[in-house]
Amino acid sequence: GNAASWGGGVAALGSTFNMYGGVISDNMVSASAGGVLLSDKSVMNMSGNAQISNNIAPTKWTTSGGGVYIFASTDGEVGNCLYMSDNAKISGNTATQGGAVYVRKNGQVTMSGNAQISNNTATENGGGVYVENSTFKIAGGAPRVCDNLCQDVQNNVYLATGNAIRISKLSTFAGKIGVSTQDTPTESNLVTVAAVAVEAGGGGHLTEEDLDHICSDKENLYPVLVGGE
């Protein structure tokens, strides 16, 4: 493995990084982005059997993105993007926030196929993915975000205030996504955790079948369909 301040394995700056296979593993950083840093409107495509595993952004202070850190875009446009398809996998990574992935302002994470984010750890929030003012999208297939932990408790996709999982209606979704939210839902104050993705040729409504694949990380909470079909 390697050691760096940011991007222990790869730092993509204003570029496209295609990872069709192979492994980025056992890297450590002193700041954030243990495995991969995406900045300056970069795109990363993980496909085939590509893996990002066992990278560390130290937890002595606030660090983010043990596997991948998706930097903020400040011009209001979609910025840095991570696309996971086929059997791509991010596992065994550690950070303070976003054990596997931390995606900031105007970033995007899209999962499809049998992509998987599992067995990552955060000490604060987002054992799997920390989503802050960004898009986390499911584009069909059977992707899974599960068995990620924060302080020994399930904490998979952590949605900061105002964020929701976006589900494409152009193809069938049959995976499993665990969800935690910054805002605490109550009977009188529902919190949106999923919505239809905005895309060309898309539209429609979420269904009960869609919600069968979204589950709360807290045992006493469960998603309900509002205004769908």
Predicted regions and their residues:
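A structural detector for beta-sheet-dominated domains
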Residues: 13, 20, 39, 47, ...
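Extracellular/surface-exposed low-complexity segments
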Residues: 139-229
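Extracellular beta-strand/beta-solenoid scaffold signature
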Residues: 2-11, 28-39, 57-77, 94-104, ...
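Intrinsically disordered, low-complexity regions of eukaryotic proteins
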Residues: 28, 42, 77-79, 149, ...
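The right-handed parallel beta-helix/beta-solenoid scaffold, focusing on the short coil/turn
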Residues: 8, 15, 22, 34, ...
